[in-house]
Design a protein with these regions (language model features):
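Bacterial N-terminal signal peptides that target proteins for export
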Residues: 2-16
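Gly/Gly-Pro-rich "capping" loops immediately C-terminal to redox-active cysteine motifs
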Residues: 39-43, 57-96, 114-119
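C-terminal capping alpha-helices of c-type cytochrome domains
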Residues: 93-136
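C-terminal segment of classical bacterial N-terminal signal peptides
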Residues: 18-27
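Short, cysteine/histidine-rich loop/knuckle motifs that typically chelate Zn2+
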Residues: 48-51
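Short, basic/glycine-rich phosphate-binding loops at helix/coil junctions
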Residues: 18, 80-82, 110
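Protein kinase-like catalytic domain
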Residues: 53-56, 134
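Electrostatic cytochrome c docking/interface patches
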Residues: 26-46, 57
Length: 136
C-alpha cells in the first residue's frame, strides 16, 4: 500500500522543502511586527550606516554597497561593490522582512557576509530605517 501524502527523503525537492521551511519562517518572523517606521527618525539613524553606505541619486559603492533602491533588489546584485561569496550566493531579495532580519543580526542572517556590524537590537529603529530606505 502506498501513501501519497507521505514525503520520501529520496525526493530532493521534498527534502529541500522540509529543510528550508524553518529558515523561511525565521526570516518572516524577523520583521518588526506592528511597528510603524518614521522616515525622519530613520534618516537620523542612517547616519551610522553612512560611514560605509550611500543613498540617493549620486550614491555609489565604497566600503559598503549603495543602498538606493535596496528594497526589492536581489542581494549581491549591484555592480559597483565587491560582494562576499556568501552574499552573492544568498539567493534572496531584500524584502523589508529580510532587511529587518539582516539589520538585527547580519552575521546570523547571512553567515560569511562582509558587513562588519553587530546589528540593531531596537525593533523601532529597524522600522525607522526601513521607512527611510523606502524613500530612497
Amino acid at each position: 500500500m502506498t501513501y501519497p501524502f507521505l514525503l520520501r527523503w529520496s525526493s530532493p525537492l521534498a527534502a529541500a522543502a522540509l529543510l528550508l521551511a524553518p529558515i523561511a519562517a525565521a526570516q518572516a518572523a524577523a520583521a518588526p511586527a506592528g511597528l510603524t517606521g518614521n522616515a525622519e527618525a530613520g534618516k537620523a539613524a542612517f547616519r551610522k550606516c553612512a560611514s560605509c553606505h550611500q543613498v540617493g541619486p549620486s550614491a555609489r559603492g565604497g566600503f559598503g554597497p549603495k543602498l538606493t533602491g535596496v528594497i526589492g533588489r536581489k542581494a549581491g546584485a549591484t555592480t559597483d561593490y565587491k560582494y562576499s561569496a556568501a552574499m552573492k550566493n544568498a539567493n534572496i531579495v531584500w524584502t523589508e522582512q529580510n532587511l529587518a532580519g539582516f539589520l538585527k543580526a547580519p552575521s546570523d542572517f547571512i553567515p560569511g557576509n562582509n558587513m562588519r556590524f553587530w546589528g540593531i537590537g531596537n525593533a523601532q529603529q529597524v522600522a525607522d530605517l526601513l521607512a527611510y530606505l523606502r524613500t530612497q
